[in-house]
Curated annotation (Swiss-Prot):
The gene is ruvB. Residues 183-253 are annotated as: Small ATPAse domain (RuvB-S). One of its GO terms (biological process) is DNA repair. Homohexamer. Forms an RuvA(8)-RuvB(12)-Holliday junction (HJ) complex. HJ DNA is sandwiched between 2 RuvA tetramers; dsDNA enters through RuvA and exits via RuvB. An RuvB hexamer assembles on each DNA strand where it exits the tetramer. Each RuvB hexamer is contacted by two RuvA subunits (via domain III) on 2 adjacent RuvB subunits; this complex drives branch migration. In the full resolvosome a probable DNA-RuvA(4)-RuvB(12)-RuvC(2) complex forms which resolves the HJ. Its EC number is 3.6.4.-. It is an enzyme of class 3 (hydrolase). One of its GO terms (cellular component) is Holliday junction resolvase complex. The keyword Cytoplasm applies. Belongs to the RuvB family. DNA binds at R310, R315. Its main location: cytoplasm. This is Holliday junction branch migration complex subunit RuvB. Keywords: ATP-binding, Cytoplasm, DNA damage, DNA recombination, DNA repair, DNA-binding, Hydrolase, Nucleotide-binding. It is found in: Cytoplasm.
């Protein structure tokens, strides 16, 4: 499948740009109000006690600000933030090297934490509970365990698949937060703030239009903003007005609902099944896409907005999908 403009993965060239647009203070961080409120209380209490924060887990679809909110937490706690990803921690020695380099009250952010191997989790448990690292030297009857004390630290785990976390690991997080999709009005504010940082003039209705097509996700909103800015530059316009914005978004293949070719292909597959559940493996084979991408990238927004139902037997299109695609729902009796 070709590269999607609404793809939720962070592209290499976007990393430095994302950092420049990232909010640095709570007042700059838009959305996730309940999470912000709870975190502000926890941070204030931890600072008064002069302790590290409890370990915390952020889960939800990609692109909703898990990393950004972790940067703000570290800034508020006046401490260091170390960032890594579970696939990079292949051996217990990799984790030991990270943990032994932490200072008191530092924050360790592990992305895709559901991908940690069971062996790595076993090393992590005493580190989280007792701030202790148990290193096994040797093997068999001659094996010895060396205990290394660690400074108190905070582990922030981020995952798009909370259900894949083992129960022992999940239970060791003192706080757990589900990141929600953003409203169009919240996304419009994010877009206008980002445009100002980019020194780009943008009309209110243009920001609203981009927000409407951003699938409730800041990462997509910022990506669309930058692509529309490119169209404005090519047209020698210093202002992103509605005409340029509509032209750019249509050229990018993102419709009024934020759907692209992949979304519509997915929904068409379900709708044409006429009420029969379609298995994930069948969908993946038909779309030539891996199952993880379908579950983590395509489905969450469609599911949250009522375009499909997940059942034990598979996925089913809702009446909303049939109405969108203008595919009539057949009477079940006519299917047999």
């Amino acid at each position: 499948m070709k590269e999607r403009i609404v793809n939720l993965e962070t592209l290499d060239f976007e990393t430095s740009q994302e950092a420049s647009l990232r909010p640095n203070l709570w007042e700059d961080y838009i959305g996730q109000e309940k999470i912000k409120s709870n975190l502000q209380v926890s941070i204030c209490a931890a600072k008064k006690r002069q302790e590290s924060l409890d370990h915390m887990l952020f889960f939800g679809p990609p692109g909703l600000g898990k990393t950004s909110i972790s940067h703000i937490i570290a800034k508020e706690m006046e401490t260091n933030l170390k960032i890594t990803a579970a696939p990079m921690i292949e051996k217990s020695g990799d984790l030991a090297a990270i943990l032994t380099n932490l200072q008191a009250k530092d924050i360790l952010f592990i992305d895709e934490i559901h991908r940690l191997s069971p062996a790595i989790e076993e090393v992590l448990y005493p580190a989280m509970e007792d701030f202790r690292l148990d290193i096994i030297i040797g093997s068999g009857p001659a094996a010895q365990t060396i205990k290394i004390d660690l400074p108190p630290f905070t582990l922030i785990g981020a995952t798009t698949r909370a259900g894949m976390l083992s129960n022992p690991l999940r239970d060791r997080f003192g706080m757990s937060f589900r990141m929600q999709f953003y409203s169009p009005s919240e996304l419009a504010l994010i877009i206008k703030k980002a445009a100002a940082k980019l020194n780009q003039d943008i009309k209110e209705e243009s920001a609203d239009e981009i927000a409407k097509r951003s699938r409730g996700t800041p990462r997509i909103a910022l990506r669309l903003l930058k692509r529309v800015r490119d169209f404005a530059l090519v047209k020698n316009s210093s202002l992103m007005d509605l005409n340029i914005t509509l032209h750019a978004l249509n050229e990018l293949g993102v419709n009024e609902l934020g759907f692209d070719e992949a979304d519509l292909a997915y929904l068409s597959l379900l709708a044409n099944a006429q009420g029969r559940p379609v298995g994930l493996n069948t969908i993946a084979a038909s779309m030539r896409e891996d199952e993880g991408t379908i579950e983590d990238v395509i489905e969450p927004f469609l599911l949250a907005n009522g375009y499909l139902e997940r059942t034990a037997k598979g996925r089913i299109a809702t009446p909303k999908t049939h109405a969108l695609l203008k595919i009539p729902t057949l009477n079940p009796q006519t299917l047999f």
